[in-house]
């Protein structure tokens, strides 16, 4: 499988060669002289493609918003879960209405367990999403490939894990 001219230009550029060196190097392999203008054209196309991509800050903001939406959704589910427990306990006591006058709704234990599982799954998904985003941003967010997440980002992971533990359904 042959490597395209564009791919060769980009690989050499990423290795630190300047456009004139790339043109000279590729001219040695080619059956014709490669000009610096051709190399610059390929690099300009690559820059144009990259400029259309969202910035790391945009990606971080989107991840943060998605995690916040998941947290809010999870809190809503947790409130439903707690209401299910309240109704189940009242039902087990033989009550037909709560002290505040609201009617007792019949709830099955299987429904309560399914809701608890869903809440815990959201916890796992939130932590996994945050860790994956930190891993990706660590690879592309610095000049050193594979850089570790910043201390602030690690603190955010610890806060999320603590929040998940605090909000876990208790049966």
From Swiss-Prot:
Alphabetized UniProt keyword annotations: DNA-binding, Viral genome packaging, Viral release from host cell
GO terms for MF: DNA binding
InterPro entries for the chain: TerS_C (IPR055147), TerS_N (IPR049136)
Record has DNA-binding as a keyword: yes
Top-rank lineage group of the source organism: Viruses
Family from the record: Belongs to the P23virus small terminase family.
Assembly description: Homononamer; forms a ring-like structure through which genomic DNA is translocated into the capsid. Heterodimer with the terminase large subunit; the active complex is probably heterooligomeric.
Functional description taken from the UniProt entry: The terminase small subunit binds to the packaging initiation site and regulates the ATPase activity of the terminase large subunit. The terminase lies at a unique vertex of the procapsid and is composed of two subunits, a small terminase subunit involved in viral DNA recognition (packaging sequence), and a large terminase subunit. Both terminase subunits heterooligomerize and are docked on the portal protein to form the packaging machine.
Name of this protein: Terminase, small subunit
Organism: Thermus virus P23-45 (Thermus thermophilus phage P23-45)
């Amino acid at each position: 499988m042959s490597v395209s001219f564009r791919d060769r230009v980009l690989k050499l550029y990423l290795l630190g060669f300047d456009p004139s060196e790339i043109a000279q190097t590729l001219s040695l392999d080619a059956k014709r002289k490669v000009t610096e203008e051709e190399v610059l054209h390929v690099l300009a196309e690559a820059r144009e493609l990259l400029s259309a991509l969202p910035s790391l800050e945009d990606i971080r903001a989107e991840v943060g918003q998605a995690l916040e939406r998941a947290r809010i959704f999870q809190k809503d589910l947790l409130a439903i879960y707690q209401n299910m427990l309240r109704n189940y306990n009242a039902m087990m006591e033989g009550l037909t209405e709560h002290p505040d006058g609201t009617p007792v709704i019949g709830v099955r234990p299987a429904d309560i367990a399914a809701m608890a599982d869903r809440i815990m799954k959201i916890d796992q998904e939130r932590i996994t999403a945050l860790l994956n985003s930190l891993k990706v941003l660590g690879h592309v967010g610095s000049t050193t490939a594979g850089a570790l997440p910043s201390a602030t980002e690690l603190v955010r992971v610890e806060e999320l894990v603590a929040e998940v533990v605090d909000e876990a359904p208790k049966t």
